[in-house]
């Protein structure tokens, strides 16, 4: 499972953005602002909800291996004869703040599949809704992710024809 919300991860997240706000590091400041305690930035919901990319029982990566990807369970569990994909958009709505010690769980469901032929190839848009909840069952965030899964044209000439 995923790790609990903790100060070190919050600090590292903020350091990379060179951003400081007392509610993310100081108990009194967070309480003065109306929170129950130190909170995590809302945009960390996915960070705290995702399990590990690699576990000790997994094989070690070798030179030339494809990089590990974030597990997107529903969209890529749908059987489709597609070889490529890209994310087109994500919408996120935030609700209950994440506090130190919270354990975030993600529940995913497929919303729809819309078949479409685009310049890059024939494929389908798949939309997935992820609901992030804490250990108390409170909704932290809801996101809707759209990914286009497709097969590219057989050859470059066909792709060039589509551009004109």
Spans of features found by a protein language model:
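HotDog/MaoC-like acyl-thioester-processing domains
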Residues: 87-164
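Hot-dog-fold acyl-thioester-processing enzymes
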Residues: 1-89, 157-164
